[in-house]
C-alpha cells in the first residue's frame, strides 16, 4: 500500500512548502511481482528521467509480464536473442539494487548498455512483434463486397440541365433544327446515363421545349415528310451560355416580341371590338350627336333652361350662329341633358330608395330620430289587408283599394324610422 501522500499545490512555488527534500515525491513503493533487481522502485520524481529515455523498455529490465501486442520479439522467451544475461551484466553492479542505482547520474550508463543490447537484436524477430497494430495483419486485407455503391464514371449523371442538353443537340445538327425523337436519340448516344428511365427525362425534355421561349417549334415543309415538327433555337436568343460553357446560363431568355404582340392585339380588341364597352359608348355618343343635330335646339325646354343659366349663350342661339358652332352646341347640350336626366332621375317615379345617396348622406340630426308613425300605419294596413283577404273576391273594389300603397309608406321618413342607424357614416 502507499504511504503518506502529500497534496500538490496549484503553483510551482508552493511545492517547496510541501516537500522538504527536492528528491522526495512519494514514499518508496515495494512491488512484489517484479524480479529481485526491481524489488524496490524509487520515487516518482526519480523515475521521470528514466522514462525520458526512449530506448528503455520493459524487456531491458526483464519484467516478465506477457502482452499479446508486444509479440514474440519482446516476450521473455524472445529476449534470449538480445543476450539478456550479458546485457544485464554490462549494466554494472547497481542493477540488483535499483532503488539506489536508478538516479539521474547513473542513467547514462544504463542507456548506453541498453543501446548495445538492442543492437544485437535481429530485425527478423521484431517484425512480428513490431507490427503497426500489434495484432494479426491478416485482418487488414479483407476482401471487399462485390456490390458497388457508386456507378462507374462513364455512367454518372452529366452536370447539364435539360435546356443545355437540348441546346447542344440543336447546335450540333447541320440544319440547326431537330425533331423530338432526334433530340432523344442524340442525348442517349452521347450520355449513357439517359439510356435508363427514359420516360422520366423525356417528359422533362418536352416540358423544357414547351415552356421556354428560346425554343421555337417549326412545322415540317412539304419536301420533308414525316412525323413531328422541328425544334430550333430562337434567333434572338443569342449566346445564352457563358463562353460556350453549357453548365450555367447567363440569364433566362424571354421573347419580347410575343409579349408586345399580345399587348397590341389586346389593345386592338379593346378599341375595335364590336362587343367592347368602349365601342358601345362611342356608338351611343355618335347616335346622340346625329339625333341632336337633326332636332331643333329650341324645342326642348331643358336646353332652354341650360341656355337661360348662361346669359351670353342666349343671344348667340337666337341670332342664328354658323352650322359648325351650332352643331357643337347641340352636342354639348344633348350630353349635358342626358347626364342631368340620369342624375335627376325619372320625375314620374317619386319613390326614394332607403339606400340612396341622399338618405345615406343625411344630416346627423335626422340619423338619430326615430319616427315610428309611418311604420305603425304600414303595419295596420298590411294586417287589415291580410285579414280581409280570405272572404273577398278578386274583383272587389276594397281589394283594389287595399292593393294600392298609401303615399306615407313612400316617404323617406318611413325608411329612416325603420333603419335607426345609417349604413354609411360620413362623420
From Swiss-Prot:
Any GO CC annotation of this UniProt entry: nucleus
Tissue: Present in the vegetal pole and marginal zone but not the animal pole of gastrulae and in equal levels in the dorsal and ventral halves of both gastrulae and neurulae. At neurula stage, expressed in the notochord. During tailbud stages, expressed in the foregut, brain, hypocord, neural floor plate and in two lines of cells just dorsal and ventral to the notochord. Expressed in the adult liver.
Region called Disordered, residue ranges: 256-336
UniProt DNA-binding region: 157-251
Major subcellular site: nucleus
GO biological process, one term: regulation of transcription by RNA polymerase II
Residue spans of biased composition, Low complexity class: 285-302
Compartment(s) where it occurs, according to its Swiss-Prot or TrEMBL record: Nucleus
Keyword terms, alphabetized: DNA-binding, Nucleus, Transcription, Transcription regulation
InterPro entries in UniProt: Fork-head_N, Fork_head_dom, Forkhead_box_C, FOX_domain-containing, TF_fork_head_CS_1, TF_fork_head_CS_2, WH-like_DNA-bd_sf, WH_DNA-bd_sf
Gene Ontology MF annotations: DNA binding; DNA-binding transcription factor activity; DNA-binding transcription factor activity, RNA polymerase II-specific; protein domain specific binding; RNA polymerase II cis-regulatory region sequence-specific DNA binding
Induction: By activin.
SUPFAM superfamilies: Winged helix' DNA-binding domain (SSF46785)
CDD domains in the cross-refs: FH_FOXA1
Ranges of compositional bias, category Basic and acidic residues: 256-272
Compositional bias (Polar residues): 323-334
Protein purpose: Probable transcription factor.
The protein's name in its UniProt record: Forkhead box protein A1-B
Source organism: Xenopus laevis (African clawed frog)
Taxonomic lineage of the native organism: Eukaryota, Metazoa, Chordata, Craniata, Vertebrata
